[in-house]
């Protein structure tokens, strides 16, 4: 009898201890829940997640606990906010298993399934919601939106991968993203479109978002590396590309990009060296190889187009030189060197007003640059020279004509255009032509006058004089040691202009 009393007392003590533990556990769960909610309101999600997890651990396998579903739902929300969608789905699956009629958990699960590209599963989930709550407007709206997203995705994949229509694709992708914000495929297509449009900052933003939730995303690491290289950050680019190869050693994109970077650097260095060696055609070949890799990078492409401009002018291709400078200025409209060298190309093409305009624009960015000031002076002088009578053109001879060739040309033209051979109606015009022929001959037959004329002096202007440096226009070297080149004739009467590079 005494033994039975002892057992009874022991059982009572155990029951009391258990009740006390349950009360303590309940209080602790409530405290973890309350503290977790407070931390969420302060934006401290990691700490909140710890509190929710502690509460869930205390509940254990008691799926009927009144806070069980709520805690799982809240922790799933944090996982989703952190981009940890698989963990979020795991918690939501447990919550729905405990309470199949929980609409909020089902809507959240459908949203995450959509973000993972599991559209069919998401549609089924929304349909289950409608079976529970036929009037649920959110489920109805999302079903229609997902149908549209599926159509848009099919269309935009073709636009990006086949048509290469990056500009128009961006609007569609952003529209899709407004419905399924975390869909990785959409973010990666946006990376490609933003990169091709030159919006490097947005590429970095998209890749950062992907890597926060999936640090091993090789595709995101590839686009991040490719973008940093285009921004001129080679070392950072190589770091991300090599990191991608750690996760996938056989990844063709990362391997190809590393090879491309090395090829680009080699072509760029070769182009510069060949230019310095005055091997301009060979330099142009290397420039084209480099531009094929990086045609639109403000950092890499601008100096290449500038070097191309100089090479083309060296081989007397003025119009193509202007086009190359135009491309440099499209990438960097404030580039004073590009403006200066385009002005030099305009000088070669005898478009002195455009040359003067570019020199003046360059001066706005570099007001104290002596080369730019000299360019302005040369363009103004060339404009003055262009207004003079072109004696060489009048006689139909080259600037290099000998005295004998000058005399021969004069005699031939004088006989052909003598006023006595003209009719009365054309006599006045014929006399003017004859006078011009005589004036040209008088200027060019005299060695001293011819020299003064070739130097840019108006020999018929009694107040003319030298007026500065004349047509020789200096001879200083340009940027990176590039020297001006000589002897390009500016029409019949131009004086052997020198062009200067920066």
UniProtKB/Swiss-Prot annotation:
Where primarily located? secreted
Q: Which residues form the J domain?
A: 390-457
> Which N-terminal residues, if any, form the signal peptide?
1-25
Annotated Gene Ontology cellular components are:
endoplasmic reticulum; endoplasmic reticulum lumen; extracellular region
Q: Where are the annotated TPR repeats, by residue?
A: 29-62, 69-102, 103-136, 184-217, 218-251, 264-297, 302-335, 336-369
Cite the entry's keywords alphabetically. Answer: Chaperone, Disulfide bond, Endoplasmic reticulum, Glycoprotein, Repeat, Secreted, Signal, TPR repeat, Unfolded protein response
* Subcellular localization: Secreted; Endoplasmic reticulum lumen
The protein's name: DnaJ homolog subfamily C member 3 homolog
What species was this sequence derived from? Dictyostelium discoideum (Social amoeba)
Q: What's the encoding gene here? A: dnajc3
């Amino acid at each position: 009898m005494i033994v039975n009393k002892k057992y009874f007392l022991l059982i009572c003590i155990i029951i009391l201890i258990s009740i006390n533990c349950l009360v303590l556990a309940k209080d602790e769960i409530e405290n973890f829940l309350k503290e977790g909610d407070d931390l969420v309101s302060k934006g401290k999600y990691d700490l909140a997640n710890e509190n929710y997890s502690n509460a869930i651990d205390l509940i254990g396998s008691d799926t009927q606990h009144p806070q069980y579903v709520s805690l799982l739902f809240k922790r799933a929300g944090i996982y989703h906010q952190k981009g940890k969608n698989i963990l979020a789905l795991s918690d939501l699956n447990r919550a729905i298993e405990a309470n199949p009629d929980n609409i909020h958990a089902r809507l959240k699960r459908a949203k995450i399934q959509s973000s993972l590209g599991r559209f069919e599963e998401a549609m089924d989930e929304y349909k289950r919601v409608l079976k529970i709550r036929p009037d649920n407007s959110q489920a109805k709206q999302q079903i229609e939106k997902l149908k549209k997203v599926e159509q848009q995705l099919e269309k935009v994949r073709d636009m990006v991968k086949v048509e290469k229509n990056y500009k128009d694709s961006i609007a569609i992708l952003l529209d899709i993203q407004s419905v399924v914000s975390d869909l990785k495929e959409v973010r990666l297509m946006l990376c490609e479109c933003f990169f091709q449009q030159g919006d490097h900052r947005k590429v970095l933003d998209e890749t950062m978002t992907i890597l926060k939730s999936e640090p091993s995303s090789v595709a995101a690491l590839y686009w991040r590396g490719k973008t940093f290289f285009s921004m001129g950050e080679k070392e950072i680019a190589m770091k991300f590309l090599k990191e991608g190869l750690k996760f996938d050693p056989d990844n063709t994109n990362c391997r190809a990009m590393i090879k491309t970077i090395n090829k680009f650097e080699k072509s760029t260095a070769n182009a510069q060296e060949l230019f310095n060696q005055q091997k301009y055609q060979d330099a142009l070949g290397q420039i084209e190889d480099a531009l094929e890799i990086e045609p639109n990078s403000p950092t890499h492409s601008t100096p290449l187009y500038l070097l191309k401009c100089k090479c083309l002018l060296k081989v007397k291709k003025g119009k193509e030189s202007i086009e190359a400078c135009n491309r440099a200025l499209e990438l960097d409209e404030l580039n004073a060197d590009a403006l200066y060298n385009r002005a030099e190309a305009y000088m070669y093409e005898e478009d002195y007003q455009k040359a003067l305009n570019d020199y003046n624009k360059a001066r706005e960015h570099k007001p104290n640059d002596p080369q730019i000031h000299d360019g302005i002076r040369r363009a103004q002088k060339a404009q003055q020279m262009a207004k003079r009578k072109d004696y060489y053109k009048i006689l139909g001879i080259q600037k290099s004509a000998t005295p004998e060739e000058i005399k021969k040309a004069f005699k031939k033209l004088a006989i052909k255009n003598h006023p006595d051979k003209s009719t009365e109606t054309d006599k006045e015009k014929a006399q003017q032509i004859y006078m011009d022929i005589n004036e040209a001959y008088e200027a060019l037959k005299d060695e001293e006058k011819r020299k003064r004329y070739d130097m840019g002096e108006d020999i018929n202007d009694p107040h003319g004089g030298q007026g500065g440096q004349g047509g020789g226009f200096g001879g200083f070297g340009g940027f990176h040691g590039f020297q001006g080149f000589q002897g390009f004739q500016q029409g019949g009467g131009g004086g052997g202009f020198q062009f200067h590079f920066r």
